[in-house]
C-alpha cells in the first residue's frame, strides 16, 4: 500500500511538472447593457467584438512586487489587436497566483439605448488549467 501511495505521489508530481507551463484559459464576460462585449473562452479576446473594443490589459509578467500588465489600445476600432488575441502565460514568469484580473473596455453599440460616449468594463479571468489544479489537489490528498 505504501509503495502504491508513493507511486501515485510520483506520478502526480510528474503531472504537475508537465503541466506547469500549460496555457492559461481566458474568459471574457460582460453583462453591462449596451456593450458589444460578449462571453469568450479559449483565449479569444477578439470575441469581445473587433469593431468595438477600445483597449485591454494582459498580464505580461510579475516583477516580484506585483503583476506587470501590457496594454493594447485600439482607439480607432480598426481591429488591429486581433493578432494579439491569444496568449500563453508560462510558469517561469513566477506569478504566485493561479488567477488574475485583466480589464477589457468597450464602447456600446450604436443602436443601444445607452449614451454613445459611455463605456463599459469587462473582467477577464485567467485561470490555471483545471487539470493542474486537480493534480495539485490529488497530491494534497495523498499527504
Swiss-Prot record:
What Gene Ontology molecular-function terms does this entry list?
actin filament binding; carbohydrate binding; cytoskeletal protein-membrane anchor activity
Q: Where in the cell is it found?
A: Cell membrane
What's noted about post-translational modification? Disulfide bond(s) stabilize the native, actin-binding conformation of ponticulin.
- List the GPI-like-anchor amidated serine lipid attachment residues: 118
* Residue positions assigned to the propeptide: 119-143
The stretch of residues making up the signal peptide is 1-22
Q: Which branch of life, at top level?
A: Eukaryota
UniProt membrane topology term: Multi-pass membrane protein; Lipid-anchor; GPI-anchor
- Carbohydrate-modified residues are 111
How does this chain assemble? Monomer.
Entry function: Binds F-actin and nucleates actin assembly. Major high affinity link between the plasma membrane and the cortical actin network.
**Similarity comment text for this entry:** Belongs to the ponticulin family.
**Name of the molecule in the record:** Ponticulin
Provide the gene name from the record.
Answer: ponA
Amino acid at each position: 500500500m505504501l509503495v502504491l501511495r508513493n507511486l501515485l505521489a510520483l506520478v502526480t508530481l510528474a503531472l504537475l511538472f508537465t503541466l506547469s507551463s500549460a496555457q492559461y484559459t481566458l474568459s471574457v464576460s460582460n453583462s453591462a447593457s449596451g456593450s458589444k462585449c460578449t462571453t469568450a473562452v479559449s483565449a479569444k479576446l477578439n470575441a469581445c467584438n473587433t469593431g468595438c473594443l477600445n483597449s485591454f490589459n494582459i498580464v505580461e509578467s510579475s516583477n516580484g512586487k506585483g503583476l506587470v500588465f501590457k496594454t493594447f489600445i485600439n482607439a480607432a476600432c480598426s481591429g488591429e489587436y486581433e493578432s494579439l488575441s491569444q496568449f500563453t502565460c508560462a510558469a517561469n514568469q513566477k506569478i504566485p497566483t493561479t488567477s488574475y484580473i485583466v480589464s477589457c473596455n468597450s464602447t456600446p453599440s450604436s443602436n443601444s439605448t445607452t449614451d454613445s460616449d459611455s463605456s463599459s468594463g469587462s473582467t477577464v479571468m485567467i485561470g490555471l488549467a483545471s487539470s493542474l489544479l486537480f493534480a495539485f489537489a490529488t497530491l494534497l490528498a495523498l499527504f
